[in-house]
């Protein structure tokens, strides 16, 4: 079976959940200049074709810099924010206008045998962002640099209802007719908040947020963000992360940070469980809870491959239904990705940890340790003093977590009588 068939099947729940939802996507000017820009446009068109309501916010920093350099003007910044005097504003207007036209042209393509064929998109925009001047800060006059005052929620809503892609540029207008240079990150964040968007998607050069060791941080809650901001300092990643967290605190369900350098990053982030970048969300991504009868089907999907490999003892649906209350599970977006069971042993103060399993895609996130801790917690709550485990493949994992080698003779009689000598499982025990 072709790989894309399985991919489509697994993506179908996401396709359904994204339909008719508003997504605000921010692409900085560096992303528009990158060779991957064409692929990003194709991904946005696909997302629109699948029913998402798209608001695209573009940046223009490198384009402005090149125009300043061409005129022999030196860029001025204060607190990492551009000071936009009158000559600079001319460069801003030139850069933003040219870039907007280039983006609209790319979204208007309808070439045969291309991802754009038959798309026939309508790109809409206008004076949808009202701005105000930042003014004077620490003695520095920002002139025509502004901040978002209001997003025309109703106007954008009507355009989205008409199935247009709304394109917002980093310019805002005042009621007195002035033009202000805005940060595209601020425009995107405010648009996502005011439109009550389902998602804010922020493109950056990096795959997402990287921790101190260079490893991708896949998921964060807003309350975890300040510690990372302190570590990142004044970097652009810090700016993106701060915008993502602010949006979530203000009601946006999920913010995503993905790379504009990686082909397909947006689709991988939105249509797979593992994602591709960093997700910031208020809601709990995963839930460790006790299993219920409705979880039997998911448990079977999780443990069946391990049963077929002989790692776990086979359990029929009937057995799982009967013993479901013994199980604790980790659920992620409706998928059971890990489980473990506790069986108190009759006529003893001991219990057996059984059927500990973690989905292969999630085996490096400490979920096995979380389940072990939950099982030990439950065992202590039942007044058990000893926890046994029987294993054929994972002896070292249990030894590293305080289990000591034991024997069949050490098992309570009620469990020893059921020991399968054909499997020849190793016995370990741990004092609680």
Swiss-Prot record:
Pathway participation: Amino-acid biosynthesis; L-arginine biosynthesis; N(2)-acetyl-L-ornithine from L-glutamate: step 1/4
Keyword Cytoplasm recorded: yes
GO BP annotations, alphabetical order: L-arginine biosynthetic process
Subcellular location: Cytoplasm
Domain (N-acetyltransferase) ranges: 286-425
Signal peptide interval: none
Disulfide bonds: none
UniProt keywords, alphabetically: Acyltransferase, Amino-acid biosynthesis, Arginine biosynthesis, Cytoplasm, Transferase
Recorded GO MF terms: L-glutamate N-acetyltransferase activity
Swiss-Prot/TrEMBL catalytic activity: L-glutamate + acetyl-CoA = N-acetyl-L-glutamate + CoA + H(+)
Main localization, broad class: cytoplasm
Keyword Amino-acid biosynthesis: yes
EC id: 2.3.1.1
Single GO cellular component term: cytoplasm
Pfam families cross-referenced by the UniProt entry: AA_kinase (PF00696), Acetyltransf_1 (PF00583)
Main enzyme class: transferase
Record-linked NCBIfam families: N-Ac-Glu-synth (TIGR01890), PRK05279.1 (NF003641)
Entry's family note: Belongs to the acetyltransferase family. ArgA subfamily.
Protein name per its UniProtKB record: Amino-acid acetyltransferase
Organism: Pseudomonas paraeruginosa (strain DSM 24068 / PA7) (Pseudomonas aeruginosa (strain PA7))
């Amino acid at each position: 079976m072709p790989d894309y068939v399985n991919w489509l099947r697994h993506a179908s729940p996401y396709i359904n959940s994204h339909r008719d939802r508003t997504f605000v996507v921010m692409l900085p000017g560096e992303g528009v200049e990158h060779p991957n820009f064409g692929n990003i446009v194709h991904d946005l068109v696909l997302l629109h074709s699948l029913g998402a309501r798209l608001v695209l916010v573009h940046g223009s920093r490198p384009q402005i810099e090149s125009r300043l350099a061409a005129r022999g003007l030196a860029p001025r910044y204060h607190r990492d924010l551009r000071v936009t005097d009158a000559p600079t504003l001319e460069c801003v207007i030139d850069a933003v206008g040219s870039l907007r036209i280039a983006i609209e042209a790319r979204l208007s393509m309808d070439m045969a045998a291309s991802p754009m064929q038959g798309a026939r998109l309508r790109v809409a925009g206008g004076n949808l962002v009202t701005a105000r001047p930042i003014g004077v800060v620490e003695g520095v006059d920002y002139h025509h640099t502004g901040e978002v005052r209001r997003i025309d929620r109703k106007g954008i809503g009507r355009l989205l209802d008409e199935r247009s892609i709304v394109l917002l540029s980093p310019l805002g207008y005042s009621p007195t007719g002035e033009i202000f240079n805005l940060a595209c990150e601020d425009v995107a964040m405010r648009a996502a908040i005011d439109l009550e968007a389902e998602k804010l998607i922020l493109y950056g050069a990096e795959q997402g947020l990287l921790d101190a060791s260079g490893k991708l941080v896949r998921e964060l809650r807003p309350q975890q963000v300040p510690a990372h901001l302190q570590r990142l300092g004044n970097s652009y990643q810090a700016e993106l992360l701060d915008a993502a967290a602010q949006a979530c605190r203000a009601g946006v369900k999920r913010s995503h940070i993905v790379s504009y350098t990686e082909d397909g990053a947006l689709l991988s982030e939105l249509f797979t469980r593992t994602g591709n970048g960093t997700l910031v969300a208020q809601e709990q991504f995963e839930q460790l809870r006790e299993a219920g009868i409705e979880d039997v089907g998911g448990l079977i999907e999780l443990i069946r491959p391990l049963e077929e490999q002989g790692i776990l003892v086979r359990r029929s649906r009937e057995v799982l239904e009967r013993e479901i209350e013994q199980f604790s599970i980790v659920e992620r977006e409706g998928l059971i990705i890990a489980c473990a069971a506790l069986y108190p042993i009759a006529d003893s103060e001991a219990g057996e940890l059984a059927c500990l399993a973690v989905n292969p895609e999630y085996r490096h996130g400490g979920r096995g340790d979380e389940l072990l801790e939950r099982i030990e917690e439950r065992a202590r709550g039942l007044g058990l003093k000893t926890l046994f485990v029987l294993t054929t493949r994972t002896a070292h994992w249990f030894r590293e977590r305080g289990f000591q080698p034991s024997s069949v003779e050490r098992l309570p009689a009620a469990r020893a009588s059921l020991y399968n000598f054909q499997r020849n499982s190793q016995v370990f025990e741990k004092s609680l």
